[in-house]
Design a protein with these regions (language model features):
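Alpha-helical solenoid scaffolds in eukaryotic macromolecular assemblies
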Residues: 1-260
């Protein structure tokens, strides 16, 4: 009803009347995004950029969803208002402090040639979201950013920090990217370490899914023995023998005894 009412006023070129209708509509129904979009579109078509900006500001005070914020940013970029867009991004990541929000902010800075600002976005995001469920996506984006900047050592440090920090069950893509990275930039030792890390990840997944899969525990132990870290070998043995099979399961006991 509000849309039709405003449309009638606009068709009859009663602009101030249409403005009044839109103003009443967004005041009464501030969560209906379509009303805001239509109101802003009218002002922009009339060349009233300052008025459109004021409407966006009113809308943002309601802390709307991601698309509304991105629409505001695109609006400012249409008029080449880079600093204004940057300021909106700062508010956006505070309102919606998600991995995707920060990655968009960093890519915006990168697109504008602001490498140090982009790096700062990633660093701030890691400080805030290193334990987030989507942290893998953040670390991969950060490492790939450093690769593009020809900073392979920075990228390697990010990958290694992430692999130590993120639970293995949430790091599959990270391992795959790290192995590919080492094949491109690493020496032989680095490549071997990455491959061992990937195999370690696979065994961790197998024993997590089935702790009584003693064949996987043996394979895992052999991997650590090939690496030669006594502490890791001991740790895997201790974890393996902690998984005592049910008393009646003879087939498990035969394999379990060999661990000792």
């Amino acid at each position: 009803m509000w849309l039709k009412y405003a449309d009638v006023e606009m068709k009859n070129k009663f602009i101030n009347h249409a403005r009044n209708v839109w103003d009443r509509a967004v005041t009464l129904l501030p969560r209906i995004d379509q009303l805001w979009y239509k109101y802003i579109h009218m002002e922009e078509m009339l060349g009233n950029v300052a008025g459109a900006r004021q409407i966006y500001e009113r809308w943002m005070s309601w802390e709307p969803d991601q698309q509304a914020w991105l629409s505001y940013i695109k609006f400012e970029l249409r008029y080449n208002e880079i600093e204004r867009a940057r300021g909106i991004f700062e508010r956006f990541v505070k309102c919606q402090p998600k991995v995707g929000s920060w990655i968009r902010f960093a890519k915006f800075e990168m697109k504008n040639g602001e490498i140090s600002r982009a790096r700062n976005c990633y660093e701030r995001a890691v400080d805030l979201l290193a334990d987030d469920e989507e942290a893998e996506q953040l670390f991969v984006a950060f490492a790939e950013f450093e690769e593009k900047c020809k900073e392979s050592e920075r990228a390697r440090c990010i990958y290694k920090f992430a692999l130590d920090h993120i639970p293995k069950g949430r790091a599959e893509d990270l391992y795959r990217k790290f192995v590919a990275f080492e094949k491109q930039y690493g020496d032989r030792e680095g490549i071997e370490d990455a491959i061992v890390g990937k195999r370690r990840f696979q065994y961790e997944e197998e024993v997590r899914k089935n702790p009584l899969n003693y064949d996987s525990w043996f394979d895992y132990i052999r991997l650590e023995e090939s690496v030669g870290s006594k502490a890791r070998i001991r740790e895997v043995y201790e974890r393996a023998i902690a998984n005592v099979p049910p008393a009646a399961e003879k087939r498990y006991w035969q394999r379990y005894i060999y661990l000792w």
